[in-house]
Amino acid sequence: MSWLFGLNRGQPEPPGVPGFPEPPSPPGGSGDGGDKNRPKDKWSNFDPTGLERAAKAARELDQSRHAKEALNLAKVQEETLQMEQQAKIKEYEAAVEQIKNEQIRVQSEEKRKTLNEETKQHQARAQYQDKLARQRYEDQLRQQQLQNEENLRRQEESVQKQEAMRKATVEHEMELRHKNDMLRIEAEAHARAKVERENADIIREQIRLKAAEHRQTVLESIKTAGTVFGEGFRTFISDWDKVTATVAGLTLLAVGVYTAKNGTGVAGRYIEARLGKPSLVRDTSRITVVEAIKHPIKISKRIFSKIQDALEGVILSPRLEERVRDIAIATRNTKANKGLYRNILMYGPPGTGKTLFAKKLAMHSSMDYAIMTGGDVAPMGREGVTAMHKVFDWAGTSKRGLLLFVDEADAFLRKRSTEKISEDLRATLNAFLYRTGEQSNKFMLVLASNQPEQFDWAINDRIDEIVHFDLPGLEERERLVRLYFDKYVLQPASEGKQRLKVAQFDYGKKCSELATLTEGMSGREISKLGVAWQAAAYASEDGILTEAMIDARVADAIRQHQQKMEWLKAEGKESTKEIGKNPLQPLLEGTPV
C-alpha cells in the first residue's frame, strides 16, 4: 500500500486497487526503444531508499497523535477512489452496452440489407425465370407456327399435285375424246361422200326440178303484180276527183311543214324579245314571266310601290346633287310627256355612286332599268352583233320606257382606229352606233366609265349630257360614315336579333374623326368600312364593337387605299411611257361618224 509511505497522494487511482481493468500495454514495449534499452536484470535499478523512507514514515505515523485520523482519511480517500472507479466501470459498461447495441443495430442493418439483396436476387431470378419461360413459350409458338406453315405448305403442295394430276387426267380424257370425235367425223364424212357419189344423178335431178319450180313462181308473181299495179293506176287516172284530192293533200302537207318550221322560229324570237332577257343584260327591273313565277311577292311589291326620290340614299356634293336632280326631273317629265330621252355619260373614279344613281333615276322616272357591262361584249366574238341587236330590240318593247345603263362602257366602246380592237368588237361597236344614231322615246342610254378619254369620237357625238362624279368631300364623307355606321352597326344592334353590341362612346364625334381620316376614299370604300366594322363585332368573343376595333379597321383600310394609289401611279407612269414611244398615236385616234 503506497499510501502508507506517503507516495502518490495526489494520484486519482492508487496502485493495486481491484476494480476497473487496466488496458494492456501496447505490443512492442514503450516508445523509448522497446527491448533495445530494457535492462537485463530487473533488480539492477532498485532503489532501497524508498523502503527506508516508507518505514520511517510508518514509525512516525504510529507515534503521531493524528494516526487514527490519517487512517480514516486514507479510508475515505480509498472509498472515494473506489466509487470513482465504480462510476468509471459503469460508464465503461454503458459504453460497452452502447457498443453492443450499435453492433446489434449494424447487424440488423446488415441483415436488412442482406434480406433486401436476397429479395432483389429472388426478384431478378424470378424475372429471369419468367423471361426464360416467355422465351420458351415464344420458341414453342414459333416452332408451332413453323410447323403449321410447313404442314400448310405440304398440304398446298399436295393439293397442287392432286390438281395437276386431275388436269393431266382431264387433258388426257379430252385428247382421247377429241381423237374419237375426229375418227367418228372422218368415218361419217367418208360414208357421206360414198353415199353422195352413189346418189349423184338423183341429187342433180332434184336440184333441176327445184330451180324450174322457183323460176316459174317468180315469173307468175311479176305478171300478177304488174297486172294489179296497172289496173290500179288506170283506175286512178280515170277518176279525176281522186287525182285532185291527192295533189291537194300533198300540197297542204308541204305548206304545213314549212309553216310549222318557220312559225316556231318567229314565235320563239317574239317570246324572247317580249318576255325573255337578253344574255348581255346582267340585271333589270323589268318583270319577266320566269321572275314573276319565282318571286311573286317581290314583283307585286315592285308594281304597287310608290315613286321614290331620285337621290334617296345617294350622297353627293351640293353642286352635283343639284345637277343630277335636274336630270331626274327632266327625265321624269320626258317620260310623262312621251318625249325623246337624252343620253347621259357619267364618268369619275370607281365607287362614287354612278350605278346607284342610274337605278334611282329609273325608279324615280317610273321606268325600267337594265344594266349591262362592257366586259361581257368582247368574249362573245361573232355573236356580239346579234346580241347587241337583241338588247335594243328588247329595250324597244318596254311599255314603261327603259333606262339602259352600260357600266364600264370603255371596255368595248374604244376608238376604232387603234390596233388593239378586234374585227368582231369593231362590228359590235358599229351595231351599237347604228342603234343609237337617233334619239329614242323607248329607251334612255346612260354610259358609265372611269376612262372616258378612250371613247370613240362617234360615241361622244351621241352623248347629250356629261356628268362628272368626283370623290366625296369632307362633308359628304361624314354623311356617308354616319349612313353606313347606322346601317351596318346601329340598326343590327338595336334590332336585338343578331349577336352585335356597341360599346359606349361618342358616335357623332367618332364619325367626324373617321370622315377626316378617310380623305381620298370613295363611297364604296366607306361602305366596305361599315361591313368591316360589323364583321369585326361578329368575330369578337363577346360580340361588342369597341372604339379600338373601329380604329384598327380604319387604319387597315387607309393602308390598303394608299397601296392602291401607288399601283395607280405606277400604271399611269407606264402608260405615259407607252404614249411617249409613239407620239403620233393621239393624232391618229378617233374616227368621226
Swiss-Prot record:
One of its GO terms (molecular function) is ATP hydrolysis activity. Residues 1-242 are mitochondrial intermembrane. It comes from the Eukaryota. The chain crosses the membrane at residues 243-260. Residues 1-64, 109-129, 145-164, 570-593 are annotated as: Disordered. PANTHER family: ATPASE FAMILY AAA DOMAIN-CONTAINING PROTEIN 3, PUTATIVE ATP-ASE. This is ATPase family AAA domain-containing protein 3-B.
